[in-house]
């Protein structure tokens, strides 16, 4: 599997490079970084004390010409440029970027008509199994329980609520036969009045080096149920991304997520 990594100098990019280098079935063939990055020209394995012979570059076409797959955990504007390059070079994509606009998501979906794409806000096995648990719980706590989603991430995260929190909200809302767009309440402030019993509330915490904590609270009278997932390392995301690459190796064009990859549908 000839794999290139986007955002190669970032925290997730470094973890992905390490995962690819340690996988006997994978070959690192490219490492992309943003234009103007101070790390351009540096060996992709320098962060690990290894010499890979692959230099960090901002030349999209040069990297895509060598790759069969690109793993992308960057930002929406970067990912959209990567999608365009992938279409030019017929490269399959594993995308963990969050914060897309509706228009950008539509472009991503259109691209999946020509190339294989796995798009998931969270690629850990644990989170995706948790989504199934939430669907089950929501169906049984549909009356008399208020639903709130609390997430916490490191100080550098730029979007809120997290993509994973939104995935959890969509799983719960879908199980209840609702649209998250219609029932979500984000970041209450001031005099808000009584809680709408059909709403799903979101709260976001940012600080320190928190990798990612998510709790869905079902609060009833006399009891509450909390379903929590906590990430202590980005290793689970990197391993999930490689699992997604393997999944795409046996697929043609189409848009998939980790529920497809893990056979949880």
Curated annotation (Swiss-Prot):
PROSITE patterns, alphabetized: DAPB
Binding residue positions for NADP(+): 34
NCBIfam families for this protein: dapB
GO biological process, one term: diaminopimelate biosynthetic process
EC number per UniProt: 1.17.1.8
GO cellular component, one term: cytosol
Pfam families per UniProt: DapB_C, DapB_N
Subcellular location: Cytoplasm
Catalytic residues in the record: 153 (proton donor/acceptor), 157 (proton donor)
Catalysis: reaction(s): (S)-2,3,4,5-tetrahydrodipicolinate + NAD(+) + H2O = (2S,4S)-4-hydroxy-2,3,4,5-tetrahydrodipicolinate + NADH + H(+); (S)-2,3,4,5-tetrahydrodipicolinate + NADP(+) + H2O = (2S,4S)-4-hydroxy-2,3,4,5-tetrahydrodipicolinate + NADPH + H(+)
Homology family: Belongs to the DapB family.
KW Manganese (keyword) present: no
Known role: Catalyzes the conversion of 4-hydroxy-tetrahydrodipicolinate (HTPA) to tetrahydrodipicolinate.
InterPro entries linked: DapB_C, DapB_N, DapB_N_CS, DHDPR_bac, NAD(P)-bd_dom_sf
Lineage: superkingdom: Bacteria
Pathway participation: Amino-acid biosynthesis; L-lysine biosynthesis via DAP pathway; (S)-tetrahydrodipicolinate from L-aspartate: step 4/4
Keywords of this entry: Amino-acid biosynthesis, Cytoplasm, Diaminopimelate biosynthesis, Lysine biosynthesis, NAD, NADP, Oxidoreductase
UniProt KW Transmembrane helix keyword: no
Positions that bind NAD(+): 7-12, 33, 96-98, 120-123
Gene Ontology molecular functions: 4-hydroxy-tetrahydrodipicolinate reductase; NAD binding; NADP binding; oxidoreductase activity, acting on CH or CH2 groups, NAD or NADP as acceptor
Protein name: 4-hydroxy-tetrahydrodipicolinate reductase
Binding residue positions for (S)-2,3,4,5-tetrahydrodipicolinate: 154, 163-164
């Amino acid at each position: 599997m000839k794999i290139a990594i986007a955002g190669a100098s970032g925290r997730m990019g470094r973890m992905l490079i390490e995962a690819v280098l340690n996988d006997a079935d994978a070959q690192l063939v490219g490492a992309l970084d943003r234009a103007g990055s101070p790390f351009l020209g540096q060996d992709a394995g320098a962060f690990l004390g290894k010499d890979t012979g692959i230099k960090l570059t901002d030349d999209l076409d040069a990297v895509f010409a060598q790759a069969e797959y690109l793993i992308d955990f960057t930002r929406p504007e970067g990912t959209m440029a990567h999608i365009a390059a992938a279409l030019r070079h017929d490269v399959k994509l594993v995308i963990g970027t969050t914060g897309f606009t509706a228009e950008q998501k539509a472009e991503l979906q259109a691209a999946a008509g020509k190339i294989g794409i796995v798009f998931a806000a969270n690629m850990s096995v644990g989170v995706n199994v948790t989504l199934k648990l939430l669907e089950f719980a929501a169906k049984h706590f549909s009356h008399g329980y208020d639903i709130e989603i609390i997430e916490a991430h490191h100080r550098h995260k730029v979007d809120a609520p997290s993509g994973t929190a939104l995935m959890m909200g969509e799983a719960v809302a879908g199980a209840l036969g609702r649209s998250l767009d219609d029932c979500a309440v984000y970041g209450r402030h001031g005099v808000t009045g009584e809680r709408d019993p059909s709403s799903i509330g979101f709260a976001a915490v940012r600080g320190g080096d928190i990798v990612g904590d998510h709790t869905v609270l079902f609060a009833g009278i006399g009891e509450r149920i909390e379903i929590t997932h906590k990430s202590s390392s980005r290793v689970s995301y990197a391993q999930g991304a490689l699992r997604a690459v393997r999944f795409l190796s046996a697929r043609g064009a189409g848009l998939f997520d980790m529920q497809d990859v893990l056979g949880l549908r």
